[in-house]
Amino acid sequence: MIIHSDWHIHSEASYDSRLPIKEIEEKSLEYGFKKIGITDHLNFNDEKFVGDLKRSRELLSNLQKHCDRAVFGVELTPIEKPMFDYIKKHGNYEGYIAPVSQNPYEIELAMTKDELRALGVRYAIGASHWRVDVTGGKELGDDLNACIKEWYRQQMWLVSDERVTVLGHPWYNGRGLWYEDFSIIPRAMKDELRAALLENKKYAECNSHFFNSTLTGEKFRHQYAEFLRELFEAGIPITYGSDSHNSYKPAHVNTEKYLLEVGFADGDIKGIEECDLW
């Protein structure tokens, strides 16, 4: 066993999860995890998502009364700055119309670091999920080259932001656009992202999705494990995230198989150090 903690778990407080906090506690103990990080989504700065985060905090507070393995985190995703500003003014995004722009929209995250800390959050996973460079980016997810360019832009932005502790699921794509062959992502982009992670002293996540999803085949899984190994050998600490949503399965078992094949050993997959928690 080389994975001893899980820093990316979604509880029943997340809009897209039904995973009871009790199941997380019991299963993580069964798996031998020394630390578990609850990282429910804070996609937008609206009342709904802020309310979800407060519920997550309440669940964690109750859990921490008898479980010292649990850490309160959050998952942040890049959103377009004009939408952030609109929500800040109106409280939600109903009626929002994206402005016409010839350039990619500026990026923002839903809360400041001080706001997150005030709620008790101790670390943040920053992760790309959809395009925010153009109007209707969520619906424009099939343009391979545009998506690669936008994911690169977002991830480079995330690793330079003070709120991000861990770069979550690097190069994840919900539609699996480049999942047949990871070499589709230009080598220069991978190299520059690695350099930025190192320069900004960020963690990179080994997400179980890449090794367990039906979207990924054997070729991609081996390529992705090698990518993680390159990050590790460059001096970037690697955390593990199951990214569990609706059930807490032992996804780490299959994930470890691919990590071991590229040279990962016990002690290589890290937890977040206390000095890096808020």
Predicted regions and their residues:
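Short amphipathic alpha-helical segments, especially helix-boundary/capping motifs
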Residues: M1-I2, F33-G37, S128-R131, G168-P170, ...
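Charged catalytic cores and adjacent phosphate/nucleic-acid-binding surfaces used
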Residues: M1-S11, S17, I21, G141, ...
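A metal-dependent hydrolase metal-coordination microenvironment
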Residues: I2-R153, G241, H245-K249, Y258
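Structural motif
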Residues: Y31, L119, D161-E162, A234, ...
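A generic structural signal for alpha->beta connector loops
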Residues: C67-R69, V121, R163-V164, K201, ...
